[in-house]
């Protein structure tokens, strides 16, 4: 899994992060997959693009790409984010590696035009590169009544899922 602090498991014991929990779920459900935690706290789409070749050992036959949250936090132009993600998927396509793209959803604080441009990146890339696609790691944390992320599922920083949120 190529990602940032959400993938890495920021603020959690190593075995309680997303990758180990997902690995456990897959194993319990008899899915023969070995997940590798390629999450780096603070990573951006550019950082992910720059370290991709280093992560692609011959045994890798699929990659989950969960990047873009730090691009958002830093207010990077959506075109910059999209270009970096395109480089990642061009490389994966050339190597014949299947991919799952996990999107990010922009808040409104950068304005409606920024949100529109940013939120269009992920479905567009999923279509362009024929990727498996999940709209956000946060989707399961959204309260159906309020349509907001349940704060009891987040760490004190309000950004990273706590142990219950990872579950």
Feature-to-residue mapping (PLM):
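Active-site environment of divalent metal-dependent phosphoester hydrolases
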Residues: 9, 46, 141
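A short linear-motif detector with a strong N-terminal bias
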Residues: 15-16, 43-44, 112-113, 139
């Amino acid at each position: 899994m190529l990602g940032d602090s959400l993938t890495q498991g920021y603020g959690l014991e190593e075995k309680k992060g997303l990758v180990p929990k997902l690995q456990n779920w897959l194993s319990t459900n008899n899915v023969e997959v070995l997940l590798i935690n390629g999450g780096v706290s603070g990573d951006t789409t550019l950082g992910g693009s720059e370290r991709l070749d280093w992560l692609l050992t011959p045994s890798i036959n699929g990659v989950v790409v969960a990047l873009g949250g730090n691009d958002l936090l830093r207010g990077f132009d959506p075109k910059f984010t999209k270009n970096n993600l395109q480089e990642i998927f061009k490389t994966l396509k050339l190597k014949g590696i299947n991919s799952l793209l996990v999107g990010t959803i922009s808040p409104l604080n950068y304005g409606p035009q920024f949100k529109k441009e940013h939120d269009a990146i992920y479905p567009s890339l999923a279509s362009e590169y024929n990727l498996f696609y999940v709209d956000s790691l946060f989707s399961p944390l959204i309260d159906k009544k309020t349509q907001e992320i349940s704060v009891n599922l987040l760490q004190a920083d309000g950004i990273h899922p706590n142990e219950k949120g990872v579950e």
